[in-house]
Amino acid sequence: MKSLREEFDFPIFLNADHTHSRAGAEEVAKAGFDSIVFDLSALPLEQNVRQTREAVAALKAIQPSMLVEGEIGDIGSGSEIHEAMPDPSQRLTTPEEARQFVEETGIDILAPAVGSRHGMSRSMVRGESKQHLNIERIAAIKAATGVPLTLHGGSGTEDEDFRRAIAAGITIVHINTELRVAWRRSLEDSLAAKPDEVVPYKILPPVVESVREVVKSRLRLFSNAEAVAR
């Protein structure tokens, strides 16, 4: 990826998502990644603060320009399809926790829990329901910290919630499960349409195109929302 960026002078950004150990994070820094999500959100807050602070110092010593993102709160894990999504309202990051975490760790970017969850419910996949975000909490956390905020677990979120979240302070949005659902559905359709076909390059083009269309639609939504927020 670095070679492609240099060869074509294209702004490819290398991010290591959800790295859970100091050793793994240091490997990423030495490899020249632009940013890392150092995720110890499963730990109690005080342990998360202490270990993230130590990791930030170590990573900046290796690569001073590297952006370090920290995570607090519960947004689940894994790109899975669930029968139902748990109620996120009891697991939201508070503005006080966010301020403490940012001030005591020195992170560049914060990923708080604001109503989203990794994965999607079956009803979301069927288009029967949408995920909703706590916009007021996003605004309060942004005001309390002043740092860029990342939304993880964005798949299945209502479009208007994305627009309002970006206006309230979200800078980065992560989406994965939506892409995988599009890939799976299109692959099933392609195989059904050509049951005797065994050549991958004859099966996969519509699959790749279906994922591309989801990416394009999300980029349009986020870019327009960002322009309005400005």
Report each predicted region and the residues it spans.
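Alpha/beta enzyme core
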Residues: 1-11, 18-145, 159-175, 181, ...
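Acidic, glycine-enriched catalytic cores built around paired aspartates
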Residues: 211-215, 225
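Short beta-alpha connecting loops at secondary-structure transitions
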Residues: 196-204
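C-terminal regulatory/interaction regions
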Residues: 205, 209, 229-230
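Thr-Gly-centered strand-to-loop micro-motif
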Residues: 151-153
